[in-house]
């Protein structure tokens, strides 16, 4: 279920995020709104597209793939998100959600 979230001002100044097009930045912010209190959410691209980009022609699967790539400027080079499965269920973890 979507939640009201506050984003820190530094969210928009992330060197790794700013190299992506605005659509990817909106997607990343939208994932934060969809996540639970631990930064996890169901990996359901069709549902996420309907929630985050209801009126836009956007390839959400491609956007999620971009966010899974290692960061260029971060010392640890960790991605923004990790996609994983538990049994038959698929999930997304936002890496820096709790920081």
Which role does the model predict for each range below?
Residues 1-86, 93-99:
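Positively charged, structured surface patches that bind polyanionic biopolymers
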